[in-house]
């Protein structure tokens, strides 16, 4: 006479089978090559919007070319956008313009203006396009050029304490990275100076 299976064991077996099926379904739907902690290129706009809401005074956003180094300071987050650099710059500036709590201070590489077309094909057109984009923000933002290594050092130092978002692009022209330091959008340098002077007089 065949022995009947215990009802608890039968139920437990069914639960395990269901769990296994669910796990296989999740794995099948997961995008190929996805790994934990590595943002996918399609998500860079979402990540930018999420981070911008949290960012403030002394945070940075950098839009960099393909060969920009992966920095190791704990506060630096690098995302591969797999997108056009000028397009990413424009998107970042547009999003910052919509934010009331921050304003951009833009840094570009001082070397860029001296890179010859003969050594970097496309650099002339790039300079013109970037000037056009930054020209639209004239009067609304501060912009200055510094040597590339000096800017990287600024980011490396800031990344020890503050969050920095680096958006890596497909551009293959040197010294084209655009670095955006965020400042308080509702408190300017002149107001800060007056405040410090008032504090010093008391």
Residue ranges and their predicted role:
Residues 119-202:
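Glycine-rich, aromatic-bearing surface loops/beta-hairpins
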Residues 35-86:
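Long, hydrophobic N-terminal alpha-helical segment
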Residues 59-62, 77, 103-107, 143, ...:
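Structural motif
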Residues 108-114, 119, 123:
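Long, position-biased, composition-driven segments near the start of the mature protein
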Residues 1-12:
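N-terminal secretory signal peptides that target proteins for export/translocation
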Residues 69-70, 78-104, 124-148:
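Feature captures the catalytic cores and cofactor-binding loops of soluble hydro-lyases/lyases
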Residues 16-30:
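Bacterial N-terminal signal peptides
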Residues 64, 72-78, 89, 118-119, ...:
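Short, glycine/acidic-enriched capping/hinge loops at junctions between secondary-structure elements
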């Amino acid at each position: 006479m065949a022995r009947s299976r215990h009802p608890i064991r039968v139920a437990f077996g069914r639960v395990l089978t269901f769990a296994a099926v669910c796990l296989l379904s999740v794995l099948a739907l997961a995008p190929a090559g996805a790994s934990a902690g590595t943002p996918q290129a399609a998500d860079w706009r979402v990540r930018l919007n999420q981070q911008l809401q949290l960012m403030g005074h002394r945070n940075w956003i950098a839009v960099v070319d393909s060969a920009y180094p992966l920095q190791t300071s704990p506060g630096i987050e690098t995302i591969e956008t797999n997108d056009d650099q000028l397009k990413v710059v424009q998107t970042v500036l547009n999003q910052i313009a919509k934010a009331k709590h921050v304003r951009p201070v833009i840094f570009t590489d001082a070397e860029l203006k001296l890179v010859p077309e003969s050594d970097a094909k496309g650099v002339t057109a790039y300079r013109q396009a970037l000037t056009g984009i930054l020209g639209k923000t004239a009067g609304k933002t501060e912009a200055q050029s510094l040597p590339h290594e000096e800017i990287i050092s600024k980011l490396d130092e800031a990344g020890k304490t503050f969050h920095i978002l680096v958006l890596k692009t497909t551009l293959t022209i040197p010294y084209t990275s655009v670095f955006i330091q965020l400042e308080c959008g509702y408190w300017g340098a002149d107001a800060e100076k007056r405040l410090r002077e008032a504090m010093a007089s008391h």
